[in-house]
């Protein structure tokens, strides 16, 4: 039992990841929407999260190079985790000194730095989960704990943010986020470094640019050799996430347009919705462990299509609490369910030599889908009615199905009929 306590640490670090993620994709966009900024501006602010899909550029350092002193004192993974946490806390302190609505350019820069620090932490956490687990089943459990923590972080950063903004103002919201983030270094110091069967080949010396690109090259070549249809995997992941990314990005502008109140959004969409998302994420992890990756990914992708369909129905009906609750239930369950499953799929694509880099490549595809589609969604929503917008979203998202069936073996679903 004691050996499994690291899962609590994974859950807490996932919570911090969810909190900082929510800052970019919900808290600041909500504040901008409340200040009557248009959907294209609200959608464009998500571009500040671009580091989430560029993690592969610096993940080789995290795989192969150890932080001086910290790497020796606390271990390779924990040393990197401490550095990312410290810089994340410092950037959050900077963010506290400014109002996001006053200068969008400065806001975007600060959010970009926060995204960089948070994505670096995610690289370390992803690698830690993979290296710390000893079986495929335990890997599924670890990803489930991380997913639950991530959703709890989103819950704190949404419901807590909305109610704090009403009672105390937005500055208190960001103080709350900073306080939660400060727990990160304590958690890192409490968990143990993964014990590897083979000695990790790392160094704490600075490397020149040629060596740096050589590490990236080896990582990508290694990944490419194992995944000969890498571009196909990229396309598949891009389409797979479309049914979740676009409704999530445009949800707040839609709800405010339909005259839902801050209280209704906080209680139904964020509090109730994120609890449903946790349930979905938990069931997704259990399903992947029971029936295997192939069938789990298919089921997750199909039920995920219900999200834009329900948003289209809600937009057509207008303000209606019952329809709103049904929409939130379906959207959040599907998001949690499919999100956990696709994370396990990413982990199955990695080998042991370049775990952090290869997982970063995989997860970057998902982040790229979310960020680009959120930005383009904001532009399209400005020129289309909400029902037409979500109808187009549904049709576009369905394209993953023929790719899945036609190229299922090339998408690394080898022995896909077997359990993981």
Curated annotation (Swiss-Prot):
GO terms for cellular component: plasma membrane. Keywords: Cell inner membrane, Cell membrane, Membrane, Transmembrane, Transmembrane helix, Transport. It is a multi-pass membrane protein. Coiled coil: none annotated. The chain crosses the membrane at residues 6-26, 41-61, 79-99, 104-124, 141-161, 166-186, 230-250, 274-294, 297-317, 324-344, 359-381, 386-406. InterPro entries: AmpG_permease/AT-1, MFS, MFS_dom, MFS_trans_sf. PROSITE patterns: MFS. GO terms for molecular function: transmembrane transporter activity. It is found in: Cell inner membrane. Belongs to the major facilitator superfamily. This is Putative transporter AmpG 3. It comes from Rickettsia typhi (strain ATCC VR-144 / Wilmington).
